[in-house]
């Protein structure tokens, strides 16, 4: 959570996590837990941004976070606040605009160059030649999306970190209806980010379902539920994995023995013609699937 002094972060944090903070606590990062559909998000209330020069630690927190909540005080200049936050993030090579490709380059001592992902208008040899220009001879290049050579080159110098974000317009109960409607519409026109309204006094005004589901979707995550082969009981708390994950990835995440001794799995899902369906290790999972692994 990022915002300027008095932006309503602490009230929002309390409503999201149910955790009360004592006076002055916001001078240090404060963690809390947001529960949603069996998934637990760690929410961190950060100290208010006082100046660009004092925001280094906050930007380090933002870079390490999976997603951002930008709190904007509706009683102040909302456009200046949002622009200032986005500029500060951009200055620290953090973007809230989803790029066409995300490239990570992991240097290593041996093994040559391995590319995982898709290229546009370039070949593997083009990438190898480019990396050699920067004295990189051994590396794993991971691509999410489809990357150009320019994307690869930018990643060499430290690519932008993409963070899904939502804008929380706080203290909206202090504005009249027409002013709030006009402000919210203009703000939504000025950014591609979803804008949510929060009264700062009533937690019921918070649309947790919309916020959590948006972040979950933008992070490209899915939920799968495990079924006990002995009892038939389905675990209420899901396993969270990246979209595109396979059955064997879940086996590895549950226990190394399931991964090593994997035989097959059964999948329960409305999308399947036959449910349950017996599948192998490379079967791709979807959100809401129920999985039973036999080893």
Predicted regions and their residues:
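Short, contiguous acidic and Ser/Thr-rich linear segments
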Residues: 235-246
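Short acidic beta-strand-loop surface patches of small beta-rich interaction domains
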Residues: 264-281
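Canonical P-loop GTPase G-domain recognition
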Residues: 98, 102-105, 111-138, 142-147, ...
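Conserved G1/Walker A P-loop phosphate-binding module
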Residues: 1-108, 116, 121
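Short amphipathic, charge-patterned alpha-helical segments
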Residues: 16, 245-258
């Amino acid at each position: 959570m990022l915002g300027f002094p008095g932006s309503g972060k602490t009230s929002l944090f309390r409503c999201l996590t149910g955790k009360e903070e004592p006076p002055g606590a916001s001078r240090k990062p404060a963690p809390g837990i947001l529960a949603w559909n069996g998934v637990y998000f760690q929410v961190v209330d950060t100290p208010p941004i006082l100046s660009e020069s004092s925001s280094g630690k906050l930007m380090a927190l933002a870079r390490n976070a999976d997603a951002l909540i930008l709190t904007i005080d509706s009683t102040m200049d909302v456009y200046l606040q949002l622009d200032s936050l986005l500029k500060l993030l951009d200055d620290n090579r953090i973007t809230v605009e989803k790029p066409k490709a995300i490239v990570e380059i992991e240097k290593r001592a041996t093994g040559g160059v391995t590319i995982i992902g898709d290229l546009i208008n370039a070949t593997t040899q083009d990438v190898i030649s480019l990396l050699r220009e920067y004295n990189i001879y051994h590396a794993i290049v991971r691509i999410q999306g489809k990357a150009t050579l320019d994307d690869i080159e930018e990643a060499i110098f430290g690519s932008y970190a993409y963070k899904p974000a939502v804008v929380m317009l706080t203290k909206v109960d202090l504005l009249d209806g027409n002013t709030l409607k006009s402000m919210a519409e203009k703000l939504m026109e000025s950014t591609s980010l979803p804008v949510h309204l929060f009264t700062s006094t009533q937690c019921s005004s918070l649309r947790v379902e919309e916020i959590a589901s948006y972040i979950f979707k933008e992070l490209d995550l899915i939920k799968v539920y495990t079924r006990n082969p002995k009892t038939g009981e389905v675990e209420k708390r899901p396993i969270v994995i990246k979209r595109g994950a396979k059955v064997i990835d879940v086996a590895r995440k549950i226990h190394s023995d399931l991964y090593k001794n994997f035989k097959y799995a059964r999948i329960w899902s409305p999308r399947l013609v036959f449910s349950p369906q017996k599948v192998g290790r490379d079967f791709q999972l979807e959100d809401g699937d129920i999985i039973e692994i036999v080893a």
